Amino acid sequence: MTSILSSSEQAESLISELTIISAALMVLWLYLPGFLANTFAMMWGKWLPKTGYGPWPIDGGRNWKDGNRILGDGKTWNGLIGGSITSGIMMVLIVLQMGEPTALSETKATIFIHPLTGYEGSWWDTGSQISSAFILGTILGFSCLLGDSAGSFVKRRRGLKREGDVSSKAPLLDTLPFAIMVFAFGILFLG
């Protein structure tokens, strides 16, 4: 008799068979477009103004109650929109490169699990792999940039704003908020 496992039971079965290293690599693969959103945002934030568009700071140049800028010049609409969309495009490229998604039970041979495995019926499923991948990548990219903006907000409240091209002296606030947001949104999408 064949037992039908729910997608969460299949995921638990798969995860229990992974080593720490292969599990970490699988997570990085699934979240890659989200993690690279900061790089894409920086490129859009620097390159688009060279064409005469922007930069448009998200905070509009306004200050918070403490007298410091809310987010600063480094957080722009150019970067937020461009970084999010580029993450969506990257997820589409990953999905196109991988082909059709397989059942979770068939992924034991590789750490490179298809990002859309088990996506059918999800609230963000459009019926098309391409548009579903774009939505997933865009949301993961946006979540990364939202977390990065939250980190920037906290750094500015603590007086750790960046000076020119030099980052602040708060490496955890430069990386942790965006990683937490990507994982939180990933759990929302990937279960």
Language model regions located:
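Hydrophobic alpha-helical transmembrane segments
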Residues: 1-191
